[in-house]
């Protein structure tokens, strides 16, 4: 999953390695939908080796190798899911809102659903304040993902 950040005003991109994700869509009552995702920081990168090393240090990846997001509430309006949940980084949990936009028509029979995901948070809220203000506080998660229908 792609994330964006800024160093000295210049934009950079990295990738969080998703190890587990779940998006159970309740087609009859979308507010009953559930979203969760888990990232492995040790397999993630910040775009180039020096930044990746710094990211792992700042996020204390050796002690806390996983980042998780668990939804607490989901609203659906105008083909968008607004997913309020808790993001856990460095063993610190803070509320974050994800916007999940459906990119094409779907229904309960769809085998795949394509959607974009976007979230913004401030890393210093999680105690990840290394290299600030050179590396800005805002982290933006933005990507296009494919949801495959579960065979359960």
Each language-model region and where it sits:
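Low-complexity, acidic/polar, glycine-enriched regions of mature
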Residues: 1-152
């Amino acid at each position: 999953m792609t994330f964006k950040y800024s160093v000295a005003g210049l934009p950079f991109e990295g990738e969080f390695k998703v190890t587990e994700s779940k998006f159970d869509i309740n087609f009859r009552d979308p507010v009953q939908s559930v979203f969760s995702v888990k990232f492995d920081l040790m397999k993630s990168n910040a775009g180039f080796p020096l930044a990746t090393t710094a990211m792992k240090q700042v996020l204390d990846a050796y002690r806390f190798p996983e980042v998780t997001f668990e939804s607490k509430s989901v609203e659906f309006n105008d083909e968008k899911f607004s997913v309020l949940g808790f993001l856990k980084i460095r063993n610190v949990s803070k509320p974050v809102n994800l916007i999940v936009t459906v990119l094409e028509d779907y229904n309960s029979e769809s085998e795949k659903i394509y959607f974009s995901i976007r979230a913004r948070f401030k890393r210093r809220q999680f105690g990840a304040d290394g290299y600030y203000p050179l590396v800005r506080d805002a982290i933006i998660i933005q990507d296009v993902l494919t949801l495959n229908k579960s065979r359960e």
